[in-house]
Structure formats: C-alpha cells, structure tokens
C-alpha cells in the first residue's frame, strides 16, 4: 500500500469527526488554524525560502511572485480563513421542503461531500484556502500540491493541523500528499469509492489530465483566457483604467485579461493611449488592424488568441461590431470571465445575454472573479463547467444534498 493510499484510508476513518461537527466547532477550528498560521510564520517562510531557491532559473519571474510568501501574504491567508467564520454554515440548510396531501414530509437538506481531493500547482495560498473551505463545509480534505511549492505547503499544513488539535478537532481530517510525482496524482484521480469530489487547480495541462483520466467526480476549474471588449460607445478613460488593471494588476492569475478586443470606430483613439499607459510593461501581440495603430506591437500568431499567457503579454484585435466580439469570444474563450466597456445599456445587455462564460462584466475589470471579492470568502477555484458549480467555488459549492422523508406509518 502506498503512502497516498494510507492517507486516504486514514481520512476515511476520521472524516466523520468533521462531517458531523457543529458550526461552533468548525468556527473554533478555523480561528485556531488562522492563529497558528501567523504563529508559525517563521517556519512557513523557511519552507518557502527552500522552494524559492529551487525555483531560480526554472520558472518565470511572474510565476516566482506567485510562489513567494511574505509576512503580509501569510497574514492575508489567515484573514481569508477568519473571513469564513462570519459566513453562514452551508451544511444543514433546508433547500426545499414539501408535505404531500397524505402528510408525508419531503425535505431536501445540504450535507458535506465527505472527502474532497485537491490537485494544484505552485500557489501556496491554495493550501490554506482549500483546507479552510473544507473545514467550514464539514469535509475532510487531501491536498496534493506541486513540487514547486512542496516545502511551503508542508509548513502550512503543519500549522493548520496544530490549529485543529488546539480546537479539539482531529488533525487527521487534513492531509498533504508527500509524493509530488504523477503516480500520486493518478492515485487520487482513480480513488473511486474513497474521494467524493476532486478539484484540479492549475494550468491547462494539469486540468486536462485530471478531466480525461479521473474515475472520481471532478469539478473542472478552467484556465482563464479572459477577454475585455472596448465598445464604440465606451468611456475611453474608464476603458483605459479597466484594461490596464485587468492585464497588469496580477498577470499570473486566471482572472487576468489575456485578450483585448477593440471596436474599429474608436481603435485609433484608444490603442495609442493604451500603449502609452502600459509604458512598455506589456508586450502587445496584435492583428494587422491593431498593429497599424501601435508603435511597438508584434504580429499576433495563430495561437496567441488561444493562449493563457499568465505574463505581461496581451493579444489585441480590432473588431467591426459587438457581434464580432461575441463571436470571437465564443470561439476562443475558456468560459471564465469576459468584460465589455460601454455606455450603451442595450449593447451591454446584448453582450451579457450572448456571452456564455461563468462571469460576465459590464464596465468592470475581470480581476473581480474571486471568492473573496464575491463575498464568498476564499475559494477552491473558478469553475468553468455548468454542472453543480460555476464561477468561484465557495462554501455552498462544497456541499451536496440528501432527501429526508418523514412519515407516520406511510406505505405505498
């Protein structure tokens, strides 16, 4: 039996302690987990320093920033856990209830999944976010992070387990897989009958591998080829702020904009202003119409409109209408987040109606697609599928339901 299988069996043996925990018990656990994260900052930073040293020359500067932990980022992780305490318990909610004419009562009630698995890559904060969401929603969780962030994740899980123990909750309801090879990932994907839900979070290759090979239920958190469309009726000052923010505020995350579509009637006014505002910070890869209006853009290649750059790179295209923008998005989007900038309410309504993505914005940056920004607390990921969960996966999406039928000697 492998170490991963041993962890799974241990989680199965202990999951009832969190599946059946009261709201008070779960909130006490979260509070202690957050406190221990801060208390063990030194150990977490030491683990992160090892990961950062290993990352030198192997991943981009943008991805290194994604990996980096600081005291401030650890405090933010703790704050994310504390934010969950104030949110309603998603377990035990009466979703639907009816009583038949013969007196038989049928109640649909929310319950935890049981044991949730998470496969992710190089962002250390995902470790604490996933664990905290699992605890609040009453789930045990097995975490399998990438090798790039292993020492960071190990230190974080140690702190979280200390918090659970301090609060009187079994620390054996959170486990980190020590093996970061493909073997352990495959073991989780095929742990049918043990893992109730598996969520992959990372690049397109990881997500595709899980979706194609898993025999356990999966929620796909898709890559983010996010678009911003600047309409002919846009306020160009507003558009400039939105595009710059959507691309540059944190380019390594999935809600950053990767493609800019600009209406031909305002392209000559807007694109030179955008290029100036970006000050050479972003490499623009433009179609022929856009390139003619820009000084330093390079020609867009065949794959540029289908690439999640996660870097200071943006594909740019000039379109003749909102319909062409919608058509382009339908062809190239991953269904994550899209935005329109326009002062025309009819055009905005047309865009939101016809763009089929998890989050569609009017006059706002795509960077808001986030559990915290949506008032959901931290998130497990951004689901781009349509069944069960779509958009930021918060507490409610970490539950399923069962029917409780109460009678008085009823027979059929």
Curated annotation (Swiss-Prot):
Domain of life: Bacteria
UniProt catalytic activity: L-glutamate 5-semialdehyde + phosphate + NADP(+) = L-glutamyl 5-phosphate + NADPH + H(+)
Cited Gene3D superfamilies: Aldehyde Dehydrogenase, Chain A, domain 1 (3.40.605.10), Aldehyde Dehydrogenase, Chain A, domain 2 (3.40.309.10)
EC number in record: 1.2.1.41
GO terms under cellular component: cytoplasm
Transmembrane segments: none
Entry annotated with the keyword Cytoplasm: yes
Location of the protein in the cell: Cytoplasm
Alphabetic keyword roster: Amino-acid biosynthesis, Cytoplasm, NADP, Oxidoreductase, Proline biosynthesis
Presence of keyword Cytoplasm: yes
A Gene Ontology BP annotation from the UniProt entry: L-proline biosynthetic process
Major place of residence: cytoplasm
SUPFAM superfamilies, per database record: ALDH-like
A GO term for molecular function: glutamate-5-semialdehyde dehydrogenase activity
Pfam families referenced in this protein's UniProt entry, alphabetically: Aldedh
UniProt pathway: Amino-acid biosynthesis; L-proline biosynthesis; L-glutamate 5-semialdehyde from L-glutamate: step 2/2
InterPro entries from the UniProt entry: Ald_DH/histidinol_DH, Ald_DH_C, Ald_DH_N, Aldehyde_DH_dom, G-glutamylP_reductase_CS, Glu-5-SA_DH, GPR_dom
Membership in a protein family: Belongs to the gamma-glutamyl phosphate reductase family.
Function: Catalyzes the NADPH-dependent reduction of L-glutamate 5-phosphate into L-glutamate 5-semialdehyde and phosphate. The product spontaneously undergoes cyclization to form 1-pyrroline-5-carboxylate.
Stated name of the protein: Gamma-glutamyl phosphate reductase
Biological source species: Streptococcus suis (strain 05ZYH33)
